[in-house]
Design a protein with these regions (language model features):
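Flexible, Gly/Pro-enriched loop and linker segments at secondary-structure and domain junctions
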Residues: 77-82, 87-119
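Helical lid/core segments from catalytic subdomains that handle acyl or acyl-like groups
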Residues: 32-88
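Structural preference for long, well-ordered alpha-helical segments in enzyme cores
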Residues: 1-5, 138-143
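Core RNA-modification/binding signature centered on pseudouridine synthases
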Residues: 118, 122-123, 153
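Hydrophobic "lid/gating" helix adjacent to the active-site nucleophile
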Residues: 1-28
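Mixed-charge, glycine-accented linear interaction segment located at domain edges/termini
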Residues: 125-138
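Non-catalytic regulatory/linker segments of enzymes
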Residues: 37-38, 131, 144
Length: 155
């Protein structure tokens, strides 16, 4: 998702000190469930290397991080909050009343099979000043292209 969203300029705009800023590259911040406490950590990981390298780094960082929150999120991240326990048709998050919060939030739920196809609920929440439906459509196309090329049997 990060790779595809980074290819679409509108997903990289943010408000910073009252001004509009376009970041060259956006990294990731995701929730990670600490199974022992059933509390979530917010983990920040630079999006670098291959997908396999990124996943290995992200898993290691999530497991090693002791703090649940390491401070306010920076502007140069995409937020991810997966919910693999439920299949949903709609999800909505509060925005804490911050009108200048332009950090996109991506969610996905529990995948399921229907008509011999694997389906995954996926939600995108964005700031409408920068991202419109056409941009979300471009993201969906890029994600689908990437998924169509992915060899699941090698993983």
């Amino acid at each position: 998702v990060t790779e595809c969203a980074n290819q679409i300029e509108e997903f990289r705009y943010r408000f910073l000190d009252g001004k509009i800023v376009l970041f060259d590259k956006i990294d990731t911040a995701f929730t990670y469930l600490d199974k022992a406490t059933e509390l979530f950590k917010v983990v920040n990981v630079p999006f670098e290397g291959s997908m396999q390298e990124y996943c290995k780094t992200a898993k290691h960082k999530a497991e090693m991080q002791k703090d649940y929150f390491t401070g306010p999120l920076s502007n140069d991240v995409f937020q991810f909050s997966p919910m693999p326990w439920v299949t949903y048709r709609h999800i909505s998050h509060t925005n804490s009343g911050k009108k200048d919060n332009a950090t996109p939030l991506f969610d996905w739920g529990k995948f399921y099979e229907k008509d011999e196809r694997l389906l995954l609920p996926f939600s995108v929440q964005v700031h409408h000043s920068f991202v419109d439906g056409v941009h979300i459509g471009k993201l969906a196309e890029k994600l689908q292209e990437k998924l169509n090329c992915y060899n699941y049997e090698d993983k």
